[in-house]
A protein has these predicted regions:
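Periplasmic-binding protein-like
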Residues: 55-59, 145-179, 201-207
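A ligand-binding cleft/hinge motif common to bilobed small-molecule-binding domains
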Residues: 24, 37-45, 97, 127-150, ...
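Flexible hinge/capping segments at coil-to-helix
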Residues: 63-83, 172-173
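Ligand-binding cleft/hinge of the Venus flytrap
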Residues: 1-9, 51, 77, 88-111, ...
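Short helices/loops that flank or line small-molecule/ion binding pockets
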Residues: 20-32, 74, 114-135, 142
Length: 208
């Protein structure tokens, strides 16, 4: 965000907030910008999608002793425990359809923050979780016990995630200025350096 606001000549104030609350604050105009937001028609009603941040790959990670049971998403129902998911996160259309099934919902354990979801894995409250692939790889580096216990079994969704601006809180003129500013820095050495730091990619084919 600082790369964007510096280019746009704006001042950035970072506000910490759980993901579901951040979406609500963006919709009401109480915060102006968010990072790493997947596109949905519902979100487009209250958020202007300024430009792609990076390509995200959502994966299902499962306890290795149960990994052989999972061949498709609905096989979660074969597990003797829960799968952790981030509340209000978007993991692709297939997941949206499946999670609407009451029989499937009982296997999902919701977290309000990434930290809560990480703790579910560390404390073995869940048998797996849906994660951003780069996030899971980073957690494996930081916490070797996770790498020993969990493995990626399915890729659920590959799609760009965006920087967005509140339609309620940010004027149309400023939203356009921000969009133009992001276009100037997108793919620049500074942008690529940020992506490399977190293991992210601009190219969808890189995540295949």
């Amino acid at each position: 965000l600082r790369l964007l606001t510096n280019e746009a000549g704006c001042t950035l104030e970072v506000v910490g907030s759980p993901w579901p609350r951040s979406l609500n604050l963006l919709e009401s105009g109480d915060i102006d910008l968010m990072l790493t937001v997947s596109y949905t028609e519902e979100r487009n009603q209250f958020a202007e999608f300024l430009g792609v941040h990076y390509m995200e790959e959502s994966v299902l990670v499962i306890d290795k002793q149960y990994a052989s049971r999972i061949r498709k998403l609905t096989d979660i129902g074969l597990l003797p425990g829960f799968v952790g998911v981030l509340r209000d996160a978007y993991y692709g259309e297939e997941f949206e359809q499946v999670k609407a099934d009451p029989d499937f919902q009982q296997y999902l354990l919701y977290a309000n923050t990434l930290t809560q979801k990480l703790n579910m894995l560390k404390r073995q409250r869940v048998l797996g979780s849906v994660e951003d692939k780069t996030q899971f790889i980073e957690w494996n580096r930081q916490y070797p016990e996770l790498a020993q216990r969990y493995q990626i079994v399915l890729t659920l969704h590959r799609a760009p995630v965006y920087i967005v601006a509140s339609r309620q809180g940010v004027s149309k003129e400023l939203r356009q200025h921000l969009k133009n500013s992001w276009a100037k820095v997108y793919g620049s050495p500074e942008h690529l350096a940020i992506l490399a730091e977190f293991g992210w990619s601009l190219d969808e084919s890189d995540t295949a």
